């Protein structure tokens, strides 16, 4: 488990730190995501910078109203699987949003620390949560879902269609997804380049 610093003023002692970019000579040889992944201690240190605001502007600014301070606290404590569970309660594709969502204009832009201390690296921590949880074998718990026997057709296997399918499955409904392309993902697969979003994330 990552060690959590006991200093409640860590946002002063530890500045905002984004993941490092891969070396240029390495980026020239491959067409994959350009940022190195966060290490456990890095993610814990950055998550612990969160002030846990009583009225979290980051959460309000988020289009899906993610429980951002809550899962940042879990990451700071090293509880990655619980953070993944919480993250998936409000977001069907957090592993994608952590990579492509414009956090600088949304959650991070609204962070209380943004003026003066540098916003918490919310997007990078969100990416760390899902990548680490999946690597640990975590999958959403569907054991309590009761099948309804109903089926719903969804036209389009892009992010909206996939998100809709996820919500239906959690409600016990079987989604039947139709798309003109042979692969799922829509814009995620055919529009966003791999240096921003590797296609393996969707598999």
Predicted regions and their residues:
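Ferredoxin-type iron-sulfur electron-transfer modules and their immediate structural context
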Residues: 1-151
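Generic beta-strand/beta-sheet core signal
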Residues: 53, 155, 178-180
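Residue-level detector of alpha-helix initiation sites
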Residues: 92, 158-159, 183
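Fold-independent oxyanion-binding glycine-rich loops
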Residues: 114, 125, 157, 180-181
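N-terminal glycine-rich dinucleotide-binding loop that anchors FAD/FMN and/or NAD(P) in oxidoreductases
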Residues: 120, 191-203
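N-terminal Rossmann-like FAD-binding beta1-loop-alpha1 element of flavoenzymes
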Residues: 151-176
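Gly/Ser/Thr-rich beta-alpha loop segments that engage phosphate groups in nucleotides
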Residues: 160-163, 187-188, 193
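Glycine-rich FAD pyrophosphate-binding loop
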Residues: 173-189
